[in-house]
Regions:
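Catalytic active-site module of serine/aspartate enzymes centered on a nucleophile-bearing elbow/loop
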Residues: 280-313
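Active-site loop/oxyanion-hole signature of alpha/beta-hydrolase fold enzymes
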Residues: 47-50, 87-127, 163, 301
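Short beta-strand/loop motif that positions the catalytic acidic residue
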Residues: 249, 255-257
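Acidic catalytic loop of the alpha/beta-hydrolase fold
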Residues: 234-236, 260-264, 290
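Conserved alpha/beta-hydrolase catalytic His-Asp/Glu region
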Residues: 25-26, 164-165, 185-248
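Conserved hydrolase catalytic core segment
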Residues: 122-163
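Alpha/beta-hydrolase fold catalytic core
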Residues: 1-56, 81-83, 122, 308-313
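Conserved HGGG/HGGXW glycine-rich cap/lid loop of the alpha/beta-hydrolase fold
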Residues: 48-95
Length: 313
């Protein structure tokens, strides 16, 4: 019995060492490129584009297993021509570091609210993609005075009973997360990464440069597995609390969905939510879940319409 246990120990140490190596290499390939802000509970990494722009500021919040390059890959530069654009790595994601307990949706919203205040942003448009949409909704409910409105792209807005297929591997019990994160999660992620990305982007193709220019490589780290597993497990209860308060939302809310989204249901997370939030609008376009990457021009045009006063349209 001692020999097999010893072999398991050696194997585990080997996997942990290799996982750490892969994580370091990913961070070398996709390095931090912005600034860090100290907020309660986290060191937030963010990138600021065109800080002197005269147009309304835009704050962009990425989704599950993502990071700020999901926006800078294709979309943010288009908007930065005449807007101050701030891209944020959510707490625990990308290059943002936690300095306290892992935060849920509402706590992340609170941290981003502090960053908005620290940067002196005057009612920015808050753009949330996927899980970032849920965080944006929480911020609008708790700190509505900070934002001019929400622009939600393929957002998580409802209780999702069945975890989307690309993320089922994140369904780890709390007690097993560290073990899985530092042993099997990284090698499995490296092996299945292309297929997982294809499923998330479907029916749109995955850009050849997404791993680097889009930050995709950072998803294959122990840190990312831990964060993703936590959010997948915590989401149903947290979304129940948000959904119950949708009638309280006072800021303008616009939702954009791809008709062929293979990750989140546009009818549930788009149509149902637009009917529940006072004055909310929904627009559907051709495409899948990763619209900021795969359909940047259409997404930009939609965002610019939201930023243009009705009388000027």
């Amino acid at each position: 019995m001692l020999i097999p246990l010893g072999l398991l120990g050696v194997l585990g140490l080997g996997l942990a060492g290799w996982s750490a190596y892969v994580g370091r290499k990913a961070e070398e390939m996709v390095p931090a490129e912005g600034k860090f802000a100290e907020v309660p509970g986290a060191h937030l990494h963010y990138v600021e584009l065109n800080p002197e722009a005269e147009g309304p500021a835009i704050v962009m919040v990425h989704g599950l297993m993502g990071q700020l390059r999901n926006f800078s890959h294709s979309l943010a530069g288009l908007l930065a021509a005449d807007h101050r654009v701030i891209l944020i790595d959510r707490p625990g994601w990308g290059h943002s570091q936690l300095v306290g307990p892992r935060p849920g949706i509402a706590a992340q919203a609170g941290m981003i609210a502090v960053l908005i205040e620290q940067l002196g942003l005057e009612k920015p448009l808050l753009v949330g993609h996927s899980m970032g949409g849920a965080v944006s909704l929480a911020l609008a409910l708790d700190r509505p005075q900070l934002v001019r409105g929400l622009a939600l792209i393929a957002p998580l807005t409802q209780i999702v009973e069945t975890v989307p297929a690309p993320f089922k591997g994140l369904l780890a019990p709390l007690a097993l997360r560290p073990l899985l994160a530092w042993t099997v999660a990284v090698p499995v992620g490296v092996r299945t990464g292309p297929a997982t990305a294809a499923a998330i982007f479907a029916p749109d193709p995955v850009p050849a440069d997404f791993a680097l220019a889009g930050g995709g490589a950072l998803a294959v780290r122990p840190k990312s597995y831990m964060a993703g597993s936590f959010e997948i497990r915590a989401a149903p209860a947290e979304m129940a609390g948000l959904v119950a308060r949708y009638g309280e939302i006072k800021v303008p809310v616009a939702i954009l969905y791809g008709r062929e989204d293979a990750v989140l249901d546009p009818q549930l997370n788009g149509e149902k939510t637009a009917a529940e939030i006072p004055g909310a609008t929904l627009e559907l376009i051709d495409g899948g879940h990763m619209l900021p990457v795969t359909h940047p021009e259409a997404t930009e045009a939609w965002l610019r319409r939201l930023l243009t006063p009705p009388a000027a349209r």
